[in-house]
Every structure is written in C-alpha cells, then in structure tokens.
Amino acid sequence: LLEAYRGSISQLEWMSPATRQEALAKLEQFTVKIGYPAKWRDYSSLQLSATDLVGNVRAAEAFEIAYEAGKLGKPVDRDEWHMTPQTVNAYYNPVMNEIVFPAAILQAPFFDLEADDAVNYAGIGAVIGHEIGHGFDDQGSTFDGPGAVRDWWTEADRKAFEERTGALIAQYDAYVPADVAAHYEQLGQAAPHVKGALTIGENIGDLGGLGIALKAYKLALARKGIESFDQAPVIDGLSALERFFYSWARIWQQKSRLERAELLLATDPHSPNEFRCNGIVRNLDEFYETFNVVPGDELYLDPDQRVTIW
C-alpha cells in the first residue's frame, strides 16, 4: 500500500514538484503499528461493581482522567496505543504520523488467510489505504512528517486539492440513504441528505483507500508475473476485479434502525455505509469496465465528474 501511494503521488499531474517532495517525505515517515502494543495498560486500580452501572461509568471516567493527567511533565510515549487490540477498527494519529491496526480487524471480512489477494486488498488493503489517506486529507494534510502543524503546500496545489474535494462534497451532498428516503416519502416531507462537508475527511480516506488498494493489488499481481487484471485467475466464476469490488461491498454491509440512521446522518463524520461503498466505486473507471456500467445506470457518473485525488 505504501508503495502504491508512493507511485501515485509521484505521478499526480495536479501537484507541483515542491509539494510532491513534501508529500513523499511525509509518506516515508509514517509509523505502522499492527496487532497490539508493546506494553499493556495497568487497570488493576480501577474498581468496578457488578451492580452499579452509573458508579462504574464514573469510576472509569475518573480513572481515565487520572491516567491522562499523569502524563503531564513526562516524555511523550510513542509506543502508546489509543485503541484496544480487540477493537474492530483502525486509526491515523496526525501528531505522531502513525497508522494503527488492532488485531481484531485482521479477520474476515477484512482479512482472511484463506481468501485470495483480490478479496484481501479490497478489505484490509482498502482499510490500510484509508488510514494512510487520512495523512493527506483535509485535516491530515496540515501536518508534516514529524507530526507538526505546518503548511507544506503551495497555494496553487492547495487550490487544486480543494477543487477536487469540493467536487466530492457536492457528490455526497446529493445522497440520501434508501431507508431514510422511503420514510420521508411516506411522510410527504423532504428527506435529510448526507452532509458532504462533515464527511469529507472520511470520504477522501475511502476514495483514496480503495483506489490505492486497487493499485497495490495490481503491483502484487505483477510480482507474480501477472501483468493485467484480465490475466488473473477466475475463481468461482468471478474475475479478479469482480472479486475485488464484491469484497469492498461486503465490508460495508449494515442493518440499522431508522432512528439510528438519522442520528448518524446528522452527526457522524463517516458517510452511511451505503455510500461508503457505492459513492466510492462510481468514481473508479475500473468499476465501469468490470460491470459494464453505462449511461442511465444508477451509479453512472460522466467521466469528467469522477473524482480522483490520490
């Protein structure tokens, strides 16, 4: 994934040599943490009760506040994790310029030792690409390689970046989750839309993550002497790219109550899963070629409307 980002950044036509050099330097300084921390937190002083829920919440909050206050005046612990190993998630920490992948996300549907590369690159590969992408999104791009807030962009490059992110914001502003749309149609009211500006950081991560994962998969095939996706083996009647895109769709399967969907729509910096999947693939040319998507199809976007950032 890092190699794919390196190659992509090196070839970006909208980025000047000065900014490209800074971006590549930041990429080389990423720290990667996988699985679990080198040392474990000690929770022995946290006293909990099986019969006092509110008391437990208060005790946990007090414990955490004391833990954070105890860091004052001490050197920064660069080995610290801010997510437990049993959490199915991952994160990017801009002040450390680190990407962290807990053990729990290294399982199906994201990663499966029995699955082929197409499936895994669209799963954990896209997650890795997403977290790297946060280093170059609307917020992460304001930090440099060592993790300091610094403007390392030329004015023209920042403008070009914002033009692309603006187009992505406009795409997502138009989306309404299917269940929410159906509910408001019954009410005869206008349905709330995805907030493109609120979700732009995560949408940049998703778009870059899947696009770079696809490039990384192509690099992996090339190492095996396979020069194109068409030459990759067909498995269970599915081509390599079909398996890739189906794997991407699978990781975003979700069921939720309408009330939950509306709450997330109003407050969550992540787009609804429906659009984390469909809103991304419609920007990738390979999706159109794989499934013969043509004008008139629901996910079709004119080529000049498709957004590529990284």
List the model feature ranges, each with a label.
Residues 1-131, 135-310:
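Intrinsically disordered, low-complexity linker/terminal regions across diverse proteins
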